[in-house]
């Protein structure tokens, strides 16, 4: 039976038995309804195709991705990853998802190399085995717990696998080396190969045995060579014999029926070959590592997608703003052309004003963009904030007066000079004031307050207006880069920039706003110099 | 001048410079222009002025072009006025925004779309075609 499971994203239901076929898309008539602006109404279908299943994009606007590649039609295999818009799904051929350790079977009838469980060696040490049985069981539980705890905590896969290999050397006291191969998990999708060697033992530069890796990954079988030297069937496995290994075992890393790689443990110690119990524990640990590896891969994918989405959002927002400015420039020059043709001076002036205004807007936009992206250390110097605020207020006063909006600067007491980056704070306050004036209509007022808090050594700048205020859904996103309520006039960078400046000062930014009640932005800034700068030259 | 000249055009855009641009293009084609700076004002002007055609910007603060268009179509007095939508919305959302998708949002489609930045000849041609038909 085939099943689709939603791993990430909005959809209903969260799981779907595919049966003969299923259509995925935004339309409520689809078998699996997926939300989001990137999803077409009928986006993609999955259908029975001979003995298996196939997937076909239904001409969606934004395409379908299977295992990281765009496709129009493809055969589906168990464990395949499907991306539709922001939604991530996995395709499973068995409805009963089986964890890797129980999915794995030891195959005693394996014809080549190593199905050898060396019972003779174990019988010889029978009395010690009984005596250490409880200890062994406890060690197993310990190692499983340790690996699964680390599997939950560490998302960097290389580090996680190293920890797990160390754990293997701890639990298999006779082991000299532990190796892991994770296919496609390395840089540039190369295989990730890691090995650890017990302190004081010879290093094994060759890494994992290719013979064992082949059996583990191609046949999905766990492999045990109890006593390599005693087994004449191992002649083919030169890589094992030539390294003086006496006993070795290997388990695939399985996620469902997908092979992610394999782990191997070996010993050069002739008296302590690995047992079938040891192999079973290795299989269980392999299961934990596989889950962790898969988590790490998913995490990496989500981060990459979020990064791409953020870049896409930035580029499209900027493109939109630039288009609006271009529209203004084009409009202005069109009007200038008409004026020149008709020798109509008023028209020329009118068109030219439009050109200048839009060039100015573009210039402000570029300044905001650069200020938002710049990663320079702020230079805080004692600054007369009253003077700075007065200057900044003057910059918006003309626009405010034209709209019939009153402006005022209110200073509480005699605030001491504060150590701020004057350019950054001026830009931040100017953005807040510009927003406030734009939000206000005739008869409203905009006020800047400056108050010092001597007890806490901080100053507070408040930009307050009695304009329309903000709805909760606007308030929630108001500091997000590229979020704007100004239609074509906004870049969505103004408030994001204010937040950045305040964070650079290790200050605090808060917003009070309710619909119909106006808005107040409070900027708290530490008044004193940061220690490293104060003690500097 | 064709038969389509001398009509009354309502331009709805929050950006005064964009209004002036469209006004210049329309006046050049011999039309008269009334303007509104937002969706609500646009609806009121449409009722008061009974324009022959409406040029409507999509991206406006407050009542956006989609909502304004949907309300125009719901109003029996206004539903038959042809609408040219000025759009850069596909770029804004970063997706291929088709007419079908637009239909999804507002149930109906405007008579024509013109992309910003506006090409004066294309806007004039589109309006002439709609008014001359």
Language model features with spans:
Chain B
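Conserved sequence signature across two-component system core domains
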Residues: 12-13, 36, 54
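Charged docking surfaces used in two-component/phosphorelay signaling
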Residues: 20-28
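Active-site beta3 strand of CheY-like receiver
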Residues: 49-55
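Alpha4 helix (beta4-alpha4-beta5 surface) of REC/receiver domains from two-component response regulators
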Residues: 64-67, 71, 90-115, 121, ...
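Receiver (REC) domain active-site loop signature in two-component systems and cognate sites
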Residues: 60
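Active-site residues of response regulator receiver
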Residues: 13, 57, 87
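Helix N-cap/capping motif at the beta->alpha junctions
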Residues: 35-44, 65
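Non-catalytic signal-transmission and effector/linker regions of two-component phosphorelay proteins
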Residues: 1-8, 115, 119-133
């Amino acid at each position: 039976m085939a099943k689709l499971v939603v791993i990430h994203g909005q959809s209903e239901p969260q799981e779907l038995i595919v049966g003969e076929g299923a259509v995925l898309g935004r339309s409520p008539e689809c078998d699996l309804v997926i939300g989001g602006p990137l999803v077409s109404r009928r986006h993609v279908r999955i259908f029975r195709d001979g003995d298996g299943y196939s997937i076909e994009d239904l001409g969606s606007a934004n395409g379908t991705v299977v295992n990281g590649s765009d496709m129009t039609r493809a055969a589906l295999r168990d464990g395949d990853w499907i991306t539709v818009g922001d939604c991530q799904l996995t395709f499973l051929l068995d409805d009963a998802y089986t964890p890797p350790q129980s999915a794995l079977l030891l195959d005693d009838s394996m014809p080549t190399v190593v199905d050898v469980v060396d019972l003779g060696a174990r019988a010889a040490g029978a009395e010690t085995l009984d005596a250490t049985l409880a200890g062994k069981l406890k060690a197993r539980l310990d190692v499983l717990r340790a690996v699964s705890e680390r599997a939950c905590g560490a998302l960097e896969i290389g580090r996680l696998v190293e920890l797990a290999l160390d754990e293997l050397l701890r639990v298999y006291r006779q082991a000299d080396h532990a190796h892991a191969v994770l296919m496609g998990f390395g840089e540039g999708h190369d295989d990730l190969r890691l090995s650890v060697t017990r302190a004081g033992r010879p290093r094994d530069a060759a890494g994992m045995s290719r013979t064992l890796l082949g059996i583990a990954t191609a046949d999905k079988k766990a492999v045990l060579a109890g006593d390599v030297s005693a087994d004449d069937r191992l002649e083919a496995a030169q890589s094992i014999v030539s390294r003086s290994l006496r006993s070795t075992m290997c388990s695939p890393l399985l996620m469902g029926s997908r092979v992610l790689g394999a782990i191997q443990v070996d010993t050069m110690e002739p008296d302590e070959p690995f047992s079938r119990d040891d192999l079973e524990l290795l299989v269980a640990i392999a299961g934990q590592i596989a889950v962790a590896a898969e988590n790490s891969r998913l995490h990496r994918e989500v981060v990459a997608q979020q990064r791409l989405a953020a870049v896409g959002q930035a580029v499209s927002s900027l493109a939109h703003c630039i288009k609006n400015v271009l529209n203004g420039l084009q409009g202005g020059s069109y009007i200038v052309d008409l004026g020149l043709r008709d020798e109509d001076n008023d028209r020329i002036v009118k068109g030219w004003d439009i050109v200048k205004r839009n060039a100015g807007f573009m210039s402000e936009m570029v300044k905001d963009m650069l200020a938002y992206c710049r990663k320079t250390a702020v230079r805080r110097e004692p600054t007369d904030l009253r003077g700075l605020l007065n200057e900044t207020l003057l910059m918006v006063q003309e626009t405010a007066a034209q709209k019939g909006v009153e402006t005022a600067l209110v200073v509480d007491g005699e605030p001491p000079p504060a150590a701020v980056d004057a350019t950054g704070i001026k830009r931040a306050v100017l953005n807040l004031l510009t927003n406030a004036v734009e939000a206000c209509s005739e008869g409203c007022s905009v006020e800047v307050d400056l108050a010092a808090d001597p007890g806490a050594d901080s100053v507070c700048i408040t930009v307050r207006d009695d304009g329309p205020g903000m709805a909760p859904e606007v308030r929630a996103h108001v500091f997000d880069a590229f979020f704007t309520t100004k239609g074509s006039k906004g870049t969505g960078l103004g408030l994001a920039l204010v937040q950045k400046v305040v964070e650079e000062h290790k200050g605090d930014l808060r917003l009070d706003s309710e619909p119909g009640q106006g808005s107040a932005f409070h900027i708290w800034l530490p008044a004193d110099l940061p220690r490293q700068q104060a003690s500097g030259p | 001048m064709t038969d389509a000249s001398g009509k009354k055009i309502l331009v709805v855009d929050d950006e005064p410079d964009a209004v002036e641009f469209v006004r210049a293009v329309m006046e050049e084609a011999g039309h008269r222009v009334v303007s509104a700076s937002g969706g609500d004002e646009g609806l009121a002007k449409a009722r008061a002025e009974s324009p022959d055609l409406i040029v409507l910007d999509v991206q406006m603060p407050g009542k956006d072009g989609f909502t304004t268009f949907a309300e125009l179509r719901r109003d029996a007095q206004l539903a038959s006025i042809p609408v040219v939508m000025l759009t850069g919305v596909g770029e804004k959302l970063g997706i291929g925004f088709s007419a079908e998708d637009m239909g999804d949002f507002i149930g109906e489609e405007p008579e024509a779309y013109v992309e910003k930045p506006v090409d004066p000849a294309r806007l004039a041609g589109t309006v002439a075609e709609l008014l001359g038909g």
